[in-house]
């Protein structure tokens, strides 16, 4: 039995399609109601949870494989896993965004940056050797500059529609985001053949 944790929502839908294309019977997933754990043929048990919980399950050896966004991996300080595959779904970017005049403004204090991702934000500005104030927001991060709480934001940008609707633009692209397949290192040691088989089937589905 291989236990898999998958992020609920958009990633769940996109990975389900990819697994079907790889030849896995995902009927139980498509027909499930409020179940949080389902078993499918090929001896796979799939657990559905929030993105951070997927990493927690993997960290504690509850699951062998996790499907989770690169944004969650970069924000989390747990790194004792193997990243075996970029699924190339859920693609978007991390970006610094603000009003168009951001780069021309003179700041006589630390810049205030709003984000749901303080670790990524801190690392990004540390590479630029900039000391900033990070303001953590959980909701619509775009509100930071709009209400005057922050000078700019670091957030995921998919279409850019929300930014433009609020007068904001991408100042700089930080990194590319997509869904990744990660594996518990102990699981990989003892279940390597089965895990590699899953990777190869997914890779074949991506190229066909």
Curated annotation (Swiss-Prot):
It catalyses: 1-(5-phospho-beta-D-ribosyl)-ATP + diphosphate = 5-phospho-alpha-D-ribose 1-diphosphate + ATP. Keywords: Amino-acid biosynthesis, ATP-binding, Cytoplasm, Glycosyltransferase, Histidine biosynthesis, Nucleotide-binding, Transferase. GO terms for molecular function: ATP binding; ATP phosphoribosyltransferase activity. GO terms for cellular component: cytoplasm. Its EC number is 2.4.2.17. It is found in: Cytoplasm. Pathway: Amino-acid biosynthesis; L-histidine biosynthesis; L-histidine from 5-phospho-alpha-D-ribose 1-diphosphate: step 1/9. CDD domains: PBP2_HisGs (cd13595). It comes from the Bacteria. Pfam families: HisG. One of its GO terms (biological process) is L-histidine biosynthetic process. PROSITE patterns: ATP_P_PHORIBOSYLTR. Heteromultimer composed of HisG and HisZ subunits. Lacks the C-terminal regulatory region which is replaced by HisZ. HAMAP family: HisG_Short. Belongs to the ATP phosphoribosyltransferase family. Short subfamily. Catalyzes the condensation of ATP and 5-phosphoribose 1-diphosphate to form N'-(5'-phosphoribosyl)-ATP (PR-ATP). Has a crucial role in the pathway because the rate of histidine biosynthesis seems to be controlled primarily by regulation of HisG enzymatic activity. This is ATP phosphoribosyltransferase. It comes from Lactococcus lactis subsp. cremoris (strain MG1363).
